[in-house]
Amino acid sequence: MKHIITVSILFILSLLQTIQAKGKDEYWYTPKASPEERKESFLKYYAEHGRKDFLTGIFNQIARVAIGQPMEDEPTYKAVALVRSNRDCNDFSINGMLRLLYMDREKTVIPAHLKKEIEACVLDFKYWWDDGRRDTTYRCYHTENHQALYHTAELLAGQLYKDRIFTNGMNGVQHVQHAKERLERWLDFRFRFGFSEWLSTYYEVEAMLLANLYDYAEDEAIRKKAGMVLDLLMFDMALNNFEGMMGSTSGRMYAHSLINGSHNTSPLTKLMFGVGTFDRDEVMAPIALSTSKYQCPKVIQEIAIDYQRPMLNR
């Protein structure tokens, strides 16, 4: 038993040292800047220090173009290759690519040679399990966040390329219709019943896709519902965070996310509420919201940092 306790203590100390060594961003326990200043600070921080590979690599490129820096070829090609590999969770990356494409419509930020690759990737993507093409690797479609990731990506892709024929034979208009029916149900269920993955690390994912819908969905009802559900999610985090940590129950969580000095949503709480740290790889929501029209209601921001009043949440 002593041996087990000793090993456990050493593991925790090692983990804490790793966290401290990695940290390039100050952990805030109280807000020190306005929401707009935090957005600017985060984009600059992540453009310089953010991860350029794996599932969230394309979001580093969003941060770069948002502050006026050029996109980089190699990380973008890696992101395209990852999506085309048909691996699980490539729906994270495709949503980042779509935000880039919509940003490019407002102001040219994607070089022509990279845009060609990204567009081909979007037109070829498998947007739902009923697409007749067989998956070559396991892909999760059914969990709460993945459902909406796929439907959001399909809606935004269909809107962009209404008259184009996708690899699966459907045109953009058909993809919009296919996604819209499923998205409306998902949004209605979240507002009526809340999240089955309540207070989980996946709020970071869901805040990102909701921001994409809020900014770019052409259907006014979907935009409005996305904003309402995003307010609901922010209120949930405001009630249950403590100085940027979600020390609550959750509908889904991995051990490595619990045994840590910060939480997957800590960059999001720092951006929205001014408490937490930007020093994590889970930044899809902060990137999306730093480049979004969405504004978190002031009353929710005030609730988020009111730690003086005891609260029982059932």
Region roles according to the model:
Residues 2, 18, 110-111, 165, ...:
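Short secondary-structure capping/junction motifs at helix and strand boundaries
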Residues 21-44:
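Intrinsically disordered, low-structural-confidence terminal and linker regions
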Residues 5-8, 31-35, 90, 111, ...:
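Intrinsic-disorder-associated interaction segments
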Residues 33, 56, 63, 167, ...:
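Catalytic cores of extracellular degradative/oxidative enzymes
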Residues 40-217:
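Aromatic-lined, polymer-binding surfaces characteristic
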Residues 1-23:
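Bacterial Sec-dependent N-terminal signal peptides
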Residues 221-314:
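Extended polysaccharide-engagement surfaces of secreted carbohydrate-active enzymes
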